[in-house]
């Protein structure tokens, strides 16, 4: 059976950036998350079977600056003073993660706490897995980042990402 570009590992990261320019606030969020030096390609929401979840500190050295890297990313930006923004990734891991795939969900919102946004994303992933398999996941998790726009109205960007390693 043909097997294309299937990630072997994944790590989770998040970041926040602030700047008077929107694009530069995104760059600052990527830097804060530690993934600014890669050419990121966003993909949809499948956690492949037998994909090992590793710490960011283990995953980053496996990647090369300029490399095309696949990611499931949630991103949110605003320059509205005092606006709270959130970006979250939820993950639902099947009971048998070696044989079965799981789900990743992206959630971005306004006004939510980091905990609420993270749990919402986690529930989204859990529901996507359940509606496919009719089974509860073996485990769920999330990564979330929130920030509040400063009083000067500088652009603020938050990101959360599941970063795949082939």
UniProtKB/Swiss-Prot annotation:
Domain of life: Archaea
Modification Pyruvic acid (Ser), positions: 45
Disulphide-bridged cysteine pairs: none
Keyword presence, Lyase: yes
Residue intervals passing through the bilayer: none
Keywords in alphabetical order: Decarboxylase, Lyase, Pyruvate
Name this protein carries in UniProt: Pyruvoyl-dependent arginine decarboxylase
GO biological process: arginine catabolic process
GO molecular function annotations of the record: arginine decarboxylase activity
Family: Belongs to the PdaD family.
EC number: 4.1.1.19
Note accompanying the cofactor annotation: Binds 1 pyruvoyl group covalently per subunit.
Cofactor(s) it depends on: pyruvate
Residues the UniProt record annotates as site (Cleavage (non-hydrolytic)): 44-45
HAMAP family, A to Z: PvlArgDC (MF_01404)
Top EC class, one word: lyase
Catalytic activity, reaction form: L-arginine + H(+) = agmatine + CO2
